[in-house]
Amino acid sequence: MQPGVLAACLLLSWTHCWSLPLLNSNEDDDLSEEDFQFAESYLRSYYHPLNPAGILKKNAAGSMVDRLREMQSFFGLEVTGKLDDNTLAIMKQPRCGVPDVGEYNVFPRTLKWSQTNLTYRIVNYTPDLTHSEVEKAFKKAFKVWSDVTPLNFTRIHNGTADIMISFGTKEHGDFYPFDGPSGLLAHAFPPGPNYGGDAHFDDDETWTSSSKGYNLFLVAAHEFGHSLGLDHSKDPGALMFPIYTYTGKSHFMLPDDDVQGIQSLYGPGDEDPNPKHPKTPDKCDPSLSLDAITSLRGETMIFKDRFFWRLHPQQVDAELFLTKSFWPELPNRIDAAYEHPARDLIFIFRGKKFWAPNGYDILEGYPQKLSELGFPREVKKISAAVHFEDTGKTLFFSGNQVWSYDDTNHTMDQDYPRLIEEEFPGIGGKVDAVYEKNGYIYFFNGPIQFEYSIWSKRIVRVMPTNSLLWC
């Protein structure tokens, strides 16, 4: 039996070893006994401690707290060793069934295929899609990996393939039972004989070729990464990140983290059709520029490319998320954002459209057009926006101009637009992002931010953009 399969079986055999509550919570979080049971089951499934021989380290409460700390670190959360609302929310997101630690990295050798010509076979189909749609999704998913490596994938219709693909429910014959709708979506085994390379999909899910339900192509591309020998990635922008996020209808490009991982196993291919693979931003990059900033219920949301950093007022370390993991309906990248606290809304802009999220939910009737706010046709996008609660005014920045909007009358103020350089001397002719706090406006222009005093109407400090993220 393949060592990875043996480790998986040993892992599962200890799944129900503990019954006592082994975790503590933050006092401010109202968590139920069911929440603790769910969290402990999650940690046993995805953060089960194995030694190199594949044997469980039974250390009861201490071990479980260690697993929780490891899980919090893996997902970029504040590492407390205590169960809290943010940690539980991550645990409850739909995800891959392969453990985040242990199974792939307990063996001293690298798990990879010795040959570059691999076969796959579709054993059965989901009733959610036509046979043609399923076949197209799997073919496209394999192409994600063959585009950047020397690997070739050929479908066979009979016999045993290197990668056997099947749909099943609950206990389906491999000691890794599925759990019904949501939760665990699919799993795959590392390269090798027997189960090695095989990918299984939970047929209690609703599989689609769109944003509804779970997109089969995206889940399959992730699982086939495991079939080729990849672990889960800590990079929230990576395809191999364990949590499912629908990333949009546009042309899929394999992120750089995944390219580096798969090429470390198999090397590069002859010709990459997408030589520029998206990278996850580094918050401490000295040349960091931002797309948008807004507050949201006391937190600060800092947008860059497909991502945003979520900065809690009591924490130094910002958490990084894909924008679509919070708001699947939004574009991958945004231009501007601001909060309207009195309405408990944020407004998010991209091109000539804007959306109004209330928490995770976007209000009905959105997106709307910029013209609804009174912008003329020649305004193609908003580059930054900031709302002032005491005056009911919102400033919009577009190109080298600034506009003032009256939220009470729902009209643009007269004598606007004005030139940014004349209205706020010294900050330059454009604004990438802006926010207001304690009587100061913070303007971001490339790698520089300007602290501007509303009272004295002058710049009082100039700082690097990345200092906002404690760099």
Curated annotation (Swiss-Prot):
> For this protein, what does the record note about how its cofactor is bound?
Can bind about 5 Ca(2+) ions per subunit. Binds 2 Zn(2+) ions per subunit.
The Hemopexin repeats are at 281-330, 331-377, 379-427, 428-471
> Which parts of the sequence are annotated with region: Interaction with TIMP2?
176-246
Look up keyword Transferase and say if it applies: no
Give all Phosphotyrosine modified positions.
Y366
A Pfam family this chain is assigned to: Hemopexin
- Chain residues in the propeptide: 20-103
**EC class:** hydrolase
What is the name listed in the Swiss-Prot or TrEMBL entry for this protein?
Collagenase 3
Q: Which organism is it from?
A: Oryctolagus cuniculus (Rabbit)
- Mind giving the lineage of the organism this protein is from? Eukaryota, Metazoa, Chordata, Craniata, Vertebrata
